[in-house]
A protein has these predicted regions:
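Transmembrane alpha-helix boundary signature
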Residues: 46-56, 79, 101-114
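Alpha-helical transmembrane segments and their cytosolic interface
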Residues: 1-10, 18, 161, 170-221
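Short alpha-helical transmembrane interface motifs in multi-pass membrane proteins
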Residues: 54-58, 130-136, 161-162, 189-192
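Transmembrane alpha-helical segments of multi-pass membrane transport proteins and ion-pumping complexes
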Residues: 15, 45-46, 70, 74, ...
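Membrane-interface alpha-helices at helix entry/exit sites of multi-pass transporters
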Residues: 83-91, 161-164
């Protein structure tokens, strides 16, 4: 269970860094959010190669930063609209595909003889199998679309009700699609990853309220 609390601590630190960036460039919050969206998406993709036992389930090490990516997407959808968020999602899909291809291409290049052993280790980290890469892309596109739809569907609901419900549902979709396509429908693995992701969802309030504060200030000027 200690790993869960460590993950919360890391999540809080990440959100504080994001809020600092938003404060520094508060006149360009939409640009900052887009940058954070693509940055966290890429980081999560590479960190995902390490698996962590969180006590409540086993999930990739990139789960923490991936959940901050979900929060950033929610913030874009809530404060800048569904179309804005979906443009980011579609661009993110092609961006992820390009990164996966670049990683695969890099793994095909021949290393010098003295680096061959280390290169094999590096290749195993940066270049996922075609099946895992395709599963990741499918899970991302489907779950992100579901997330944006839900968080913008009922604007009269309390902001946290929208954020938490969209994240809860979209992460079930994300995990089920990815695990089923990449490894087969392993219920135990799916449940473990869902629980780890759900444990991070309450922290999304830090980013959502932080962004709302600065967006509201800008709109009243």
């Amino acid at each position: 269970m200690l790993a869960v609390f460590q993950a919360w601590a890391y999540g809080v630190i990440l959100y504080l860094i994001y809020l600092l960036l938003i404060w520094l460039w508060k006149e360009k919050i939409d640009t900052v959010l887009v940058g954070l969206f693509f940055g966290t998406l890429t980081a999560a993709q590479f960190i995902a190669n390490k698996l962590v036992d969180y006590g409540i389930g086993v999930a990739p090490a990139g789960t923490v930063i991936f959940m901050t990516n979900v929060a950033v997407l929610d913030a874009m959808a809530i404060f800048y609209g569904r179309q804005f968020a979906m443009r980011a999602v579609r661009l993110g899909f092609f961006f992820q595909a390009a990164v996966a291809f670049a990683a695969w291409a890099a793994a095909q290049l021949p290393p010098p003889a003295w680096f061959a052993e280390r290169a094999a280790v590096v290749d195993s980290v940066i270049a996922p199998s075609a099946r895992i890469a395709l599963a990741s892309l499918a899970a991302y596109l489907i779950s992100s679309t579901v997330d944006v739809y839900i968080v913008t569907k009922w604007p009269r609901l309390h902001i946290l009700a929208r954020v938490y419900s969209s994240s809860l549902i979209s992460q079930v979709v994300d995990t089920a699609v990815f695990i089923s396509l990449a490894f087969g429908p392993e219920a135990q693995i799916i449940l473990g990853q869902i629980l780890v992701k759900w444990a991070q969802i309450p922290l999304e309030a830090l980013l959502i309220y932080g962004v709302r504060r600065y967006v509201s200030t800008l709109r009243t000027k």
